[in-house]
Amino acid sequence: MTVQMVLLTALGVGGATIFGSILCFVFKKVSHRFSDIVLAFAAGVMLAAAVLGLILPSLEYGGKYGLIFTVAGIFTGAMCLSLIDKLVPHLHKIVGADLEEHESNGSLSKVLLFVTAIAIHNLPEGIAAGVSFGSGNTSEALLIAGGIALQNIPEGMVIIGPMLAAGVSSKRTLLCAMATGLVEVIGTLIGYFAVSVASAILPFALAFAGGTMLYVISDEMIPETHAHGSQRGATYSLLAGFCLMLISDVLLG
């Protein structure tokens, strides 16, 4: 595993947010149904990645105390994100169930809080991708990074509308999207180097990363995909994402 590969993957994960923002510029108006289906598919991929690529390896690497390390890591990761959520609410908690309602008030301060929240939440997601590389399983790490990147595309699409409605210029809007993506790049590098330097923490770190991903899926992604009347489609999309990740894991494993 080379640092160059980790860096390129980190740039890809962070760049997915920018790609989503550019899509929103190109297509102007993206339907809730489309974004919900894409986000649900990403949730399925991330769910499988969290279990297959992070939590199960944590049990394996932990040896005799694997179960203790894994359970402790999962809850620690979830509680850390829960604490961040209390300090800086994210996605559906700021935007609300209806994005148009948010766009209509044009509150710049609320928009900036929204973008800051996404940036802060991107850090642990980046760390999760980096930790997976630290395990040494390149195929698993790439699948996990791919799932996180896929989730970043609709997130990047969500950033643009409220900022433009609040009067922020297109150039500054794109710069904000780039900043949120950069945070994820930094998080990926932090996660990778942390477990590379201190390999003893790998079982706990893997479970911690898995816990953060499970929290994001349950607390943010699934509620967001069910907020606009596309619950059935989102559910099947999540299952499709999960099964695709499962098939990929078996074929590449």
Annotate each PLM feature.
Residues 1-253:
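Intrinsically disordered, metal-sensing/regulatory segments
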